[in-house]
Amino acid sequence: QGHCARAGAGVCGAAIAAKKEGVDVLLVDKGVLESSGNIGGGNDHFMAVLNEAEHDTFEDMRKYYVTPTSGITDTIAYNFYKAMRPCLKVLEESGIELLRNPDGTYVRSAGFGQPGPWWIHINKGYTVKSKIAKYIKNLGIRVVNNFFVTKLLKDGDRIAGCVGFDVLKGDFVTVRCKTAVIAFGLSAQRVSTNSTRKPFNCWYSPYVTGSQIILPLEAGAAVLNLDIADKGTL
């Protein structure tokens, strides 16, 4: 059995891929699948390098992302590149409308100083997460909402589950698994990346608590570059 913690876009992708390989998947989140994660607020664009236009190749992407200070390697960039078309397939299978030109190609724009038109436009992007949630449930992936993970459980050197509580009922919950994918968020939005100190005035999800750092650390994982990456919390 596989266990995917937090139901943002990243772990939804992991859950879908695992399920399609025949794994029994349980997905848990402290919120609700239909609205959790950064994507829960909607999104009107998706980045994909498709070899269909000028400056639209992996080499263009590699030159942009793999720099001495980015922390991104050739392998990381290539794995990202390989996942783009499969992700597009899932999005369209979910019923998400990616805008197209009359010739059938995607409507795309350049952005963020990137050399090519890598950003595909999405119609009614506020529906993205709810449609992905429906797609996940139709695959038969089990979902536990409102479950806040407080500690990872170990069996030797591997993660064997987690414990936490239902944020609405207060019930204590234990999950056991053979393999875990943990994607609790990128930063700690309540403190480090919000200069106004207003908790909901931020770009990404305001509900990222820093547990993506402390829970693996408590379980014995190494944490690198926390002092320079602005991902910490008080």
Question: Where are these predicted regions, by residue range?
Answer:
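Glycine-rich loop(s) and the adjacent beta-strand/alpha-helix scaffold that form part
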Residues: 182-234
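N-terminal Rossmann-like FAD-binding beta1-loop-alpha1 element of flavoenzymes
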Residues: 2-27
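Rossmann-fold NAD(P)-dependent oxidoreductase module
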Residues: 17, 135, 215
